[in-house]
Amino acid sequence: MYNIKDIRQKIIGIKKTQSITSAMEKISAIKMKKSQNLLNSTKPYYEKISLLLNKLLFQNIKYKHPYLKKRQIKCIGYIVVSTDRGLAGSLNINLFKKLLYEINKSKEKKINTKLVLIGSKAISFFRFFEDEIISTISGIGDTPKISELIKPVQIMLKEYDSNIIDKIYIISNKFINTMTYVPDIKKVLPISIKKSSIKFKNLNYLYEPDFSSLFESILPRYIESLIYQSIVENISSEQSARMVAMKSAMDNSKNLIEELSLIYNKARQSNITKELTEIIAGSNNIY
């Protein structure tokens, strides 16, 4: 026999939780819209500067630069972009699984790894990788500043310049749409010419003052833009994942309330029937 009082308390508790998840869903929806607006405003710049760099390199294929040179791989650096807050479904764990797979592959080839961790979830998850971690940052917020983000990344770039790290990747969640976001790994260094540049082979450029100076001025902007774009995409993925998770929690709580209400009504009806039976039996005994 179900205890009516306990069922009523459970329904009240679930309704309180439902009101909290409802508020969080609305907040996440607002933040998701803002993050998508930020993503849409930064994406054209990243695409343009990537295209420009690609054009320049394709036209100067023999140009030598440390960031273009392929090395024998002894150590790979990963810039890991996660969230600061939870309640985002499997967003972070899927990303970490992908990175662990890459790290294990490198270990099999006797290749070391170094990590720059962005977001408290990555810092917490990889806390036992002390020897691999070279820098961390958390609390970047929903509208991060590139000046703050680039500081930990510069430590990894210095290790690349010192030949300690031979290749750098950034791993984050790629935002596709509100319901879809996938772990994505982009190569930061060394820079490679994309095959799409083949259509620019007949273009000729005049450089002022010269190609080398122009390339040196564009290069840091390209790296900053790549990192910032990856982080903004991860933020959009986070807000979308949280909104979907809260909506799912709302739907589940609604179904649970309906089930408990049905059990409550049946238990109440059973109690009423029992009480009526006892009253009738008692009245029969009187007569």
Curated annotation (Swiss-Prot):
GO CC terms: plasma membrane; proton-transporting ATP synthase complex
Protein name in UniProt: ATP synthase gamma chain
Function: Produces ATP from ADP in the presence of a proton gradient across the membrane. The gamma chain is believed to be important in regulating ATPase activity and the flow of protons through the CF(0) complex.
Cellular localisation: Cell membrane
Subunit structure as annotated in this protein's UniProt entry: F-type ATPases have 2 components, CF(1) - the catalytic core - and CF(0) - the membrane proton channel. CF(1) has five subunits: alpha(3), beta(3), gamma(1), delta(1), epsilon(1). CF(0) has three main subunits: a, b and c.
Keyword set, alphabetical order: ATP synthesis, Cell membrane, CF(1), Hydrogen ion transport, Ion transport, Membrane, Transport
Cysteine disulfide partners in this protein: none
InterPro entries given in the database record: ATP_synth_F1_ATPase_gsu, ATP_synth_F1_gsu
Pfam families noted in UniProt: ATP-synt
Top-level taxon in the UniProt lineage: Bacteria
Protein family membership: Belongs to the ATPase gamma chain family.
Keyword Cell membrane: yes
BP GO annotations: proton motive force-driven plasma membrane ATP synthesis
Membrane topology: Peripheral membrane protein
GO molecular function annotation: ATP binding; proton-transporting ATP synthase activity, rotational mechanism
Primary site of residence: membrane
